[in-house]
Design a protein with these regions (language model features):
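Conserved beta-strand positions in repeat-built beta-propeller and related beta-rich domains
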Residues: 206-210, 259-263, 317-321, 371-374, ...
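Gly/Pro-rich loop segments of beta-rich domains
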Residues: 176-195, 221-246, 276-304, 334-358, ...
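Short active-site neighborhood of thiol/selenol oxidoreductases, capturing the structured segment around
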Residues: 46-65, 88
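Structural microenvironment flanking redox-active thiols in thiol-disulfide oxidoreductases
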Residues: 69-110, 121-125
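Short, internal strand/loop/helix patches
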Residues: 105-140
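Thiol-/selenol-based redox modules, centered on thioredoxin-like
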Residues: 141-196
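N-terminal "domain-start" segment that seeds a small globular fold
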Residues: 22-47
Length: 503
């Protein structure tokens, strides 16, 4: 009776995607297919060796912001249940680039995943468990039987209750043997997965994302300042007494540097005279459900702000986790939704009726705001005068590739940033194609820029003084392309920029 009650709670609370069999008729779990690549373990796992533990399978794809949002919940469950629970992230990749073990390895390291990861490249496990969405959680009981599944964020409480109940109901011998976990070695580089940058006549500002810090250089390559302790937390203060968490987009002004502090779900301001870091929006908590502004910006819960653009006193925010663009008025401190309903879709029209797909990059010029709409592999344009949203390049969530040509035919793959090169041209960080693409706004054509080097998931762009700066994220470096001379150089970041004990 208690087990039937458990199943009822699990079904009702989670809105399970498929009905569950009665306890007496539950089916066996599916064995992990031989030959799949594994990370964070010394050997492939089997369902047989996991018997006696509750097994939680987390089906995800690494470019999905919703999948990133649930990683802290997985960590909490691991910490609470220890060896009674086996958490396994089953990576079922959406994009072609995500199938590569090398890029998956970079992501597992970037997000500090502490449990086993298996790369389900051909969707064998996905199909076996009839999964339909990312993220989806599948529970296997200690008896090795399938219990149920649920999809989406905010499932910690119901998973916690179900795991606790499954352990209580199990009459067999518990399996407390530790799994053969061996975590990836940390990066030993000056920069670690730099995600974004901003450049003006004084500074080259870099989001040293995996080191949870901001690096300020001058144009001679001298370190001006490191900001952030390296510990992933939300903490205001001066220089290294402050703290960030996976910072991304940056905007430089005469007096300040604004930071999209993605992992903290916050917007930060760095005073460029005192180097005091303050939080100007976000309370450090991930908003669950629909985003609401809050009585003040710092009381609001945000969802993975990824990039910023500034127009006088209006700060535009690419709110990747809510599939929207928000604005923060720096004078009135008013925070509000600017474009997008919050639905994940490729819908044009009036800005508040339109829909976006994990917007990750912004570029602003005069009355136009361009959006790198990553999950739709699209570039969107918002006319700030008329309020109209238009898709320039991109055909939908599952249409992607590497194709030049007219806007209607061209294809991108999970592009994460966009900048204005001149009044006729946009440059796009075509992240999963490892390319820089150029969009001719007059001829409505897309071409690939040949820069003579192998990029690896470039995540951020900046333009200054005839040079295109590129955050070459998975190569842990910054490079610049001289637009006139067609030459590439690497920005030499001094060793003093490296954290003494990077986390």
């Amino acid at each position: 009776m208690r087990f039937k009650l458990l199943l009822w709670i699990f079904i009702m609370a989670c809105s399970l995607t498929f009905g569950l069999a009665k306890a007496s008729a539950r089916t066996n779990s599916v064995e992990f297919p031989a030959g799949l690549p594994w990370l964070n373990v010394t050997e492939p796992l089997t369902m047989q060796q996991l018997k006696g533990k509750v097994v939680l399978l987390d089906f995800w794809t690494y470019g999905c912001v919703n999948c990133i949002h649930v990683i802290p919940d997985l960590h909490k469950l691991e910490q609470k249940y220890g060896n009674q629970l086996a958490v396994i992230s089953v990576h079922s990749p959406k994009f072609d680039n995500e199938k590569q073990l090398s890029t998956l390895t970079s992501i597992v390291r970037r997000y500090g995943m502490q449990h086993a990861v298996v790369n389900d490249v051909d969707f064998q496990l996905w199909r076996a468990y009839a999964v339909r969405a990312w993220p989806t959680f599948v529970l296997i009981g200690p008896d090795g039987k399938y219990v149920g599944q649920t999809s989406g964020e905010g499932r910690y409480d119901v998973l916690d209750r179900a795991i606790e109940q499954l352990l209580a109901e199990f009459k067999g011998e518990p399996n407390l043997k530790p799994l053969p976990i061996r975590l990836l070695d940390p990066l030993n580089t000056v920069l670690a997965a730099p995600g974004s940058l901003a450049v003006d006549e004084r500074y080259i500002a870099i989001s040293d994302t995996l080191h949870n810090q901001i690096v300020l250089l001058d144009h001679q390559g001298k370190l001006v300042k490191r900001l952030g302790s390296g510990i992933a937390e939300l903490k205001d203060g001066h220089s290294d007494s402050s703290a960030f968490s996976s910072p991304q987009g940056l905007v430089l002004t005469e007096n300040a540097l604004y930071v999209a502090d993605t992992g903290n779900h916050a917007i930060r301001r760095i005073d460029l005279t005192s180097f005091l870091v303050t939080t100007i929006a976000g309370n450090g908590e991930l908003a669950q459900g629909r985003l609401v502004p809050g009585s003040t910006p710092t009381e609001a819960s945000l969802r993975s702000p990824w990039d910023l653009a500034l127009d006088k006193t209006t700060l535009y925010i690419a709110m990747a986790g809510s599939h929207q663009i928000w604005t923060l008025d720096l004078q009135s401190s008013q925070l509000k939704a600017f474009a997008g309903t919050g639905q994940e879709a490729l819908l044009d029209g009036k800005r508040l009726d339109a829909a976006f797909n994990q917007p990750s990059g912004l570029a602003l010029r005069a009355d136009k705001l361009w959006v790198a709409d990553a999950e739709a592999s699209a570039i969107r344009q918002i006319d700030l005068s008329s309020g109209k949203v238009e898709t320039l390049v991109g055909q939908g969530l599952f249409e992607f590739g590497l194709k030049d040509g007219g806007f209607k035919r061209a294809l991108l793959q999970h592009n994460k940033d966009v900048v204005v090169l001149d009044k006729h041209t946009l440059a796009v960080a075509d992240t999963y194609n490892h390319k820089i693409r150029l969009l001719d706004l007059d001829e409505r054509q897309v071409m690939t820029l040949s820069i003579g080097t192998e990029l690896n998931e470039p995540g951020g762009l900046a333009v200054f003084n005839g040079e295109l700066y590129i955050a070459d994220t998975n190569n842990n470096r910054i490079v610049r392309w001289h637009l006139k001379d067609q030459k590439l150089t690497e920005v030499q970041v001094p060793a003093t920029a490296k954290l003494e004990s990077a986390p």
